[in-house]
Regions:
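Bacterial N-terminal signal peptides
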Residues: 8-19
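A short, gly/pro- and small-residue-rich
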Residues: 95-102
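Positively charged n-region of N-terminal signal peptides that target proteins for export
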Residues: 1-5
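Exported/periplasmic ABC-transporter solute-binding proteins
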Residues: 20-61, 66-76, 85-86, 90-95, ...
Length: 287
């Protein structure tokens, strides 16, 4: 778990941030970010703010956390890895693609059911997703963090028959968190297993049905770290500091991300935080 001592020092780090990057931006400095789509709306706002304040050009690749990690590895470039959960950050650290000492926790996430606004199918809980006639989507658990969380929840709570019925109801394995939200927002499915914050990405078309506390295995968090492919570690670290600034934290707050473990626990109950989950082979081979 990342020490909160860093957060206490973030104000000082951000204080020197703008002076340092003014010089760098004059030389045409750029940053390339590989970002899990679990933070897409607030990250887009934060990037624009960073560019406006510093003049530094920031390019962002959004997608499923596993997929963008693969892209970063194949490209052998990138300054920041900013996945949607700890699962893929642990892999990136283990395989040497980020500097472990630069990892910080940005916000926390809780899995939930997301349905069309008004809940026309009257979905009340997890078991309803296995009922006949319900169209469901989950993110692809092979490369999208929220898909792995969905599988973890199904494996914990469903009987063999319920799991079989649930799989029959799946009409789409989406490629990112953003696309998971889109399929329910466009009424292509009745429900998804996503994040509680999805409702606040698009409140006009989506609402959240909380899972029961005992159905949720763990609370997730969104980490950020400097990539070992970076050519400008100093600037990359300054971007990390900026993301942890109060100004950016307030942007995440507007979208109802949880800023602490305690906030997440107040919503769902106390749970293990972070970690990794090995998706069973039956979910990754032919599904």
């Amino acid at each position: 778990m990342v020490s909160r001592l860093f957060l206490a020092g973030a104000v000082f780090s951000v204080a020197i941030f703008f002076v340092a990057t003014e010089v760098l931006s004059e030389n045409g400095e750029r940053l390339l970010l590989f970002v899990g789509a679990a933070s897409k709306p607030p990250t887009e706002e934060a990037v624009k703010l960073f560019e406006k304040k510093t003049g530094v050009r920031v390019e962002v690749v959004f997608g499923g956390s596993g997929y963008i990690l693969s892209q970063m590895i194949l490209a052998k470039k990138g300054d920041i890895y900013f996945p949607g959960s700890s699962d893929y950050m642990e892999k990136a650290k283990r395989e040497g693609y980020v500097y472990p000492e630069t990892e910080r926790i940005v916000v926390y996430l809780v899995p939930a059911i997301n349905v069309q606004k008004g809940n026309p199918k009257h979905i009340k809980g997890l078991e309803d997703l296995a009922h006949p006639g319900i169209k469901v989507a989950i993110a692809n658990p092979e490369g999208v963090c929220v898909g792995a969380y969905a599988v973890e929840i199904i494996e914990k709570n469903f009987t063999k028959k319920q799991k079989k019925d649930f799989k029959k109801n799946i009409v789409n394995y989406t490629e990112s968190c953003a696309k998971t939200l889109t399929v329910v927002s466009l009424k292509q499915v009745d429900a998804v297993i996503g994040w509680s914050v999805f409702q606040h990405w698009n409140p006009e078309t989506v609402e959240t049905i909380p899972l029961k506390s005992d159905e949720v295995v763990r609370v997730g968090y969104i980490p950020i770290a400097v990539s070992t492919f970076t050519k400008n570690k100093v600037l990359a670290e300054q971007f990390v500091d900026f993301i942890l600034s109060e100004e950016v934290r307030s942007i995440f707050k507007e979208y109802q991300y949880f800023s602490s473990e305690q906030e997440a626990f107040a919503w769902i109950g106390q749970k293990p935080v972070g970690g990794e989950y090995a998706v069973p082979a039956e979910w990754t081979t032919g599904k």
